Amino acid sequence: MSVISTKLVTSPKQATSSNQTTSTKQVIQTWRTELKTQQNVLEATFLANKNTQQLLKNHTTLIDKLLQKIWLQANIDGAVCLLAVGGYGRGELFPYSDIDLLILLPSQHDYVLNQQVEALIGLLWDIGLNVGHSVRTQEECIGEASSDVTVQTNLLESRLLAGSKTHYLQFIKAMDALMQPIAFFVAKFKEQDNRHAKFNDTAYSLEPNIKESPGGLRDLHMILWLAGSQKLGKNWVELAKNNIITDAELRQIKRHERNLQTLRIRLHYLAKRCEDRLLFDFQNELAIDLGYETTHRKRASEQLMQSYYRSVKYISLINEILLKTLEFTLSKIAPIIVHINARFEARNSLLSAKTARTLQHYPSAILECFLLLQQHPELTGMSASLLRELQRVKKLVNRDFRDSAENKALFLKILSEKNGVNHSLRRMNNYGILGQYIPAFCKIVGQMQHDLFHVYTVDEHILNVLANLRRFAKPELKHEFPLCSQLFAAFEKPHLLYIAAIFHDIAKGRGGDHSSLGTVDAKRFCKLHGLPKNDTHLVAWLVEAHLKMSSTAQKMDLSDPAVIEQFAQFVKTERRLTALYLLTVADIRGTSPAVWNAWKARLLESLFYATKRVLNDETFSVQQTITLRQQKAAEKLAKYGLQAKSYQALWDNVGTAYFVRFESDEIAWQSRLLTPHVYADKPIVRARLSPSGDGIQVMIYTRDQDDLFARICNFFDRMAYSIVQAKIYTTINDYALNSFTILDQSGKSVSYSGLLRFIEAELSEKILATTPIETPLSGRVSRQVKHMPFATQVNLRAEASTNRHTLELITADRPGLLAKVAFIFLQLNIDLHNAKINTLGNRAEDGFLISAKNNHLLNPAQIDALSAHLNLL
């Protein structure tokens, strides 16, 4: 039964018959109120019965009847047509979508008609309709459609709402004559490519667009437009009747289309606007509305998004299959067939099976077809028939299939090929084969990670890591990462790195330590595939340790020889070091475009080289490191005409520990600047562009004071600079010698020479100031942080040998975070001895070495107060 009331279609004339003095404004308000009432009824009905198709149909009918009544009362020339076009013409009117209309004028029309049409459009807006309209003659429509495929597409789905049926049929006939299916196909295919490129060719972003993203509703519309242009059907049922899609595909398409339509409807109602992006603001509420519940393993929103990603994955697949099918139907030329082997051939550069049951009869051919694409670069992909056959037989990839020696050899061969490894595995994932072959992989397909720094699903991230490893193998890309390319070229058995990449995050979402759980899966895989013990041990170790190098580089003091020695003892061999370095770089770069930067690259490279030196030098010692750094610094200082006697006083005052904390380049730079100022009365602040090529390095030398760190952090925070490294050091003569590396957060273009002078002058003034420190700024947190709460973790460990505590703070990053932490230290009378700042996207993982005053351990009351303050950040 329709929920549409007959009240809404009462005409203005009827509404005013009982009272001739009713104003036009009152009539408009009446119509507006009735429209809103009926739209509210539609919303309530949908939320009660959750019938997506009924909502779209009834909303379309509601607007149809309203427009028809208004048109009738407007008394417009009978030769004029009112047409529904676009999504409205298709009969899919979402709650807050534009109502796309075409007012089709006769070739000859006068000023009066133009005025009537203009008044009509104004009335539609006045009563609350979001109208997207065009007013054209038939000739103008043809001209626009000839030059703009978007206009032509919009008119494909036109419906006559009111006006001359004869005129409309003439218009349809003219538009049909204009259609050139081949040209239309080429234009739409290019349009889809461009649209996908706007979303970085991935459907798996954190906040996808339900309508426009790859795998979204627009990819389904694309199929219907192209089929319609060839007169093969205007809807899915017609396509099935015309054998363009199978009955099984019909059911799957309808299921996944309905899933996205339901999400889009609910999103409109939640946002109370035409919002097609699955923003963080709505994901939690949408998930709850749809009945998802948070578990100890997955948030409700993660389950919602996994359902969404699996739908868009299927839609992307069926889009590929049907576009190839429709392209084939357009071809008037016999295909060029090239023999490949007994099972496969190339048809117009697409891999095809020689018989319809090839994969059924020879299951190993399921993997073979991916291998052939690697071995035959002239092939551009798989034919529609082969893709369909893959979907039909993929359940054959079962335990018996995985136990087959032939199939195991084929999979290892895919990983060992020189070309196409990334493309093959990505295709295997897109077509549902990779998850069948590696069951653990199936569980993480479409699984989002709300950890504030991964911006892709787990499966997409894994494939990104693999793609990054493959980039190291390409000589034409060696300029991107010269060291990685050099190491990769010399690394035997690179397929071991690919296996480690596949398994490094495969246990995400299971609960527990994903590295340990993934190691079990990796060992099982290696054993099943007959890898030698040494190779198996390497892969398993890489999966278990894949976070270690990143954590060490970003959280530990790499200038401390003890840190390097400890890491060297952990990796044990240069082969392991090389493998872990390559995997780590690929992993970090695969998490998010925002996470990787030159600073992180320099940290990892420094750790690699330092560890390699230790592994190759059995006589390594801390004293050896100190001596070497002093020698290198002295060589640099000699180039400036400085002899040892000139800076010896400075070196005596900084103490031996200084040469452990700072690298030779920093020692030389600081010595050159501070030699005349060993007992300076005023702060010495010097800034330079970081030698790593990313950020600014700032040195502060001044008499130590309790609020020094807080003042410095506050200053950089108000400059909108983020601190990526802080080295805090106190000399024997009680001077603070601190070094900060900062990065610009604003992205503004600046004059660096002026900026460096500004920092030197203004920071000196801030340090000398006797006024209280300004309260840290409360910057706006990102929407992701706001809507995906991340519990702050405070880990405090006593170092009894040094009377200090190691503090690890893991929390959502935000502007002013470090300034607030410094302010807390000041309030609680806590001394800071070192800081390691690590930002991963929207997540901060910072480390601090702290103590109470006079170098004592914190007492229980201070520990409780510190934890309480930090948890309130």
Residue ranges of each PLM-predicted region?
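Conserved catalytic alpha/beta cores of large enzymes that bind or transform nucleotide phosphates
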Residues: 129-132, 142-143, 397-408, 470, ...
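Non-catalytic interface/linker regions that flank or bridge core catalytic/transmembrane domains
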Residues: 1-13, 17-84, 91-93, 99-454, ...
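Hydrophobic alpha-helical scaffolding
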Residues: 110, 174-185, 206, 210-215, ...
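Short, conserved secondary-structure transition motifs
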Residues: 136-147, 542-551, 742
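Long, K/E/R/D-enriched contiguous segments that form extended
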Residues: 401-500, 509-515, 520-527, 537, ...
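Regulatory modules associated with amino-acid/nitrogen control
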Residues: 259-262, 285, 292, 299-351, ...
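Divalent metal-dependent catalytic cores for phosphoryl transfer on phosphate-bearing substrates
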Residues: 91-116, 241, 253, 457, ...
